[in-house]
């Protein structure tokens, strides 16, 4: 195993990327090596700590089982003490590591370390009840509950700095998600470092050798900021965000081949791309970027809403954050961890009979309008248990239908594992195989064989290759007046309403059964007269942007974009 792995490392190193994370079989072999003396013990230990996926991956199951046995004295290793085992369990996000950590709360000498680990773990889900029950007569479990109630998982993280020096990586014109994550390379999307090599590979005006330029700019010693006039239009690809963050984000301890953080400034940032950046802990800002140039060093002041040229101290752009909650999202390493953590803190405080905490910035929910609600606002309101939701309000509607298609399915699977999802909370989670059915690559064939069981064991529905297209299946299964989501255009609901999302948010909606949403504006479109022979529903859909262009609500030119 070790020889094969080193050979694989060498092949990947030649491409300038890290090796793939360990699978369950490799992890099992690694554990056998760690149980006895070995001359490469540091290398092996690093593999166990840093190169095994977290959450509910099969390899994580093997890793958690071994560490659990170490804590209970059922096995031993010359390189990992019982205390070390608890600390490593604490880096595994959630899922298979939770029960071993709960068990450690009752083991002398390990309970303190286990309490520290659980205090900073957010993906607790149903285990909350076990820990809360235990806290009634176990001081260590009580410490975990108090820590969650005080939001220490959040307050222990460093605040967003008042001033950040960045180096500009600017791509002129409109950058769509196909530029960042090309469709012909869809097969490699789950392998984030490999797929990131395809970023901006299509020749375009104003930029040559983009990846070499990125490496050159990093030598200035500042974080890079991705800058564009119009950023992230087109299909909602989480892979596009993954690629940008792979080149410009921060490493995540104990999570192999994935990064978080980063900065993205755009004259306009497409809404779904903006949300996907938020989810990943990046800092997206819409502002005038006309005075920013490739390689320029700038000072970014998030609280003052100003960006300066670092050499002249001249203000080159001013901005307003879409919401102050963004500052909390960046501090929490992403909107998804913030939502899950905030819910955990709120739930704990409610169970203890405490008032809601004021440590988080909450979305402004004041309803100033006295008008009625649009049909869309009523449907979303129904999913939130209220009469309606105004445009611009933040809400978390219940997801009745969630669709996943096969070119993003493997990425959604990885996100589900990281969310420690062992069962879906949305009523319908459906996986299709319509994109890869006709001409599958070898990697697609493997997906077709492995993904259906993954979806079905969590309570979802999986179609078979050849069963048909995701749209027509969803259309038959939708329930009127309900809300759903799915991978981008695979969410056009003829009844009910849907909001498109990248694969990370699709996984979140499937796991928790709700989805974070800043309610968009409603637009009333009314067709008059009779449908003419030969005119299809697709023609009617295309007539909407055509009419918007004629009325000046939608512009095609890249400068001064109106949407």
What are the language-model segments listed below?
Residues 40-44, 48, 81-88, 114-118, ...:
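Conserved hydrophobic register position within alpha-solenoid helical repeats
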Residues 35-39, 72-80, 103-111, 134-139:
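Short coil turns that connect the paired helices of HEAT/ARM alpha-solenoid repeats
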Residues 97, 101, 106, 113-563:
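Fe-S-dependent hydro-lyases/dehydratases of central metabolism
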Residues 2-31, 326-339:
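Amphipathic alpha-helical packing elements
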Residues 27-35, 397-403:
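Amphipathic alpha-helical segments that form the core helices of the histone-fold
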Residues 38-62, 77-79:
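An N-terminal, globular interaction/scaffold subdomain
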Residues 24-32, 54-73, 92-106, 123-135:
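Amphipathic alpha-helical scaffolding segments comprising HEAT/armadillo-like alpha-solenoid repeats
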Residues 22, 40, 51-55, 82-88, ...:
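Ligand-binding pocket scaffold of soluble enzyme catalytic domains
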